[in-house]
Amino acid sequence: KTGLFLLVAGFLLVSCGTSRKQAKALSAKPVAELTPEQQRKYDYFFLEASRLKIQKDYDAAFDLLQHCLTINPNASSALYELAQYYLFLKQAPQGQAALEKAVENDPDNYWYSQGLANLYQQQDEKEKAVRLLEDMSVRFTDKLDPLYALLDIYNRQEQYDKVIATLNRIEGKMGKSEQLSMEKFRIYLQMKDNKNAFHEIE
């Protein structure tokens, strides 16, 4: 019981934080700003949906999240949660649309962007994934995951110049390492650039 209570409490704290962040984001868009009463209702129904999700009453939680969007159609927190349901139900187009809108409305939320980038890769939409990941690498400078994801894509596409550029960006954040130098050595050999290849391991 204690473990469940902590799980619920942690989930509700995250949800409250998300709702507050959403309200803050909306304050920058006067047209979409909620009244205090609307925000109170949104928070109530969103937290209730979170509670029902924990209780595995998914149908009721889904309905409440949709109700949240009648209060605030631009609420990224509700859109993100709905996207998870759509994806679980194998309704990828609806899930992708909801995730895209969540990211559009709250571009500073790393996890929304990360979820969308992962979905693009799963759907083999590499161009969209690359655009988003490149944008994330600029917006979230403390995160290395977008750069590693780009590294994987560029490697698969054999875009070796971009692989080197991305490795250099990682090196700029982490500092030089034997692992990075050896990877650049390997890529330069693929590019038949022996001069730079051996320069890396000198």
Regions found by a protein language model. Give the residues of each.
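Register position in tetratricopeptide repeats
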Residues: 54-55, 88-89, 122-123, 156-157, ...
